[in-house]
Design a protein with these regions (language model features):
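Flexible, glycine-rich terminal cap/loop adjacent to redox cofactors
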Residues: 88-91, 102-201
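N-terminal glycine-rich dinucleotide-binding loop that anchors FAD/FMN and/or NAD(P) in oxidoreductases
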Residues: 96-98
Length: 201
């Protein structure tokens, strides 16, 4: 609810939420906003976005509190990373899917792969990974992961790649940990990146 803020002269952004700078300060000097009432910079599009998540609110609140107390913290933005569980399956997403990327002016290429989260002799379970990248720059734009195990780590890896503006080539070459009880020799996210590269070359 932003009615109180709007009534007090605080500027609302293009998303309808409260517009803030990287210090979480509103258009009214000395007044800060954070959480579900405030918009944030989207790290992929570079534009304001409204993605009300607990993790985002927590990070925003820490920056707003520090800056209100005279600190110099900065909120760098969001990728919209989220996860949920339905039964035994976890579903996670970060960044832009292909249709969203197209609407934002990118020329997206996307791929989905189905793999095992462990080698078979360690009772590997099915997992699926999708990645989206821009055809011109090869920059990763987003992705999603589903499966029974390992989903949080894989989606967080993709989110980190978005935050650092990695290309698919960079992502595919990451030096990730491997031992049979924990993962396959080629992690499913890198298998997906390798398949995506075939669409970009």
């Amino acid at each position: 609810n932003v009615a109180l803020a709007a009534g007090a002269g605080v500027r609302l952004g293009s998303t309808g939420a409260i517009a803030v700078d990287e210090r979480m300060e509103t258009s009214v000097p000395g007044v800060f906003a954070a959480g579900d009432c405030a918009e944030a910079l989207h790290l992929v599009t570079g534009r304001p976005a409204y993605v009300p998540l607990g993790t985002t609110a927590n990070r925003m609140g820490r920056v707003a509190g520090a800056c209100a107390a005279g600190g110099r913290d900065r909120f760098r933005g969001i990728a919209g990373t989220s996860i949920l569980r339905v039964g035994r399956l976890a579903f996670a997403v970060t960044g832009l899917l292909a249709a969203e990327a197209r609407r934002e002016g990118f020329d997206p290429a996307s791929v989905r792969i189905d793999a095992m989260d462990h080698v078979k002799y360690f009772k590997g379970r099915p997992t699926s990974v999708a990645l989206v990248a821009d055809r011109r720059t090869h920059r990763l734009l987003g992705g999603w992961v589903t499966g029974e195990a390992g989903v949080p780590g894989r989606i967080n890896l993709i989110a980190a790649a978005l935050t650092t503006r990695m290309t698919v080539e960079d992502f595919e070459q990451l030096d990730l940990a491997y031992t049979p009880p924990f993962s396959p020799a080629r992690d499913p996210v890198q298998v997906a990146a390798n398949e995506l590269l075939k669409l970009l070359d």
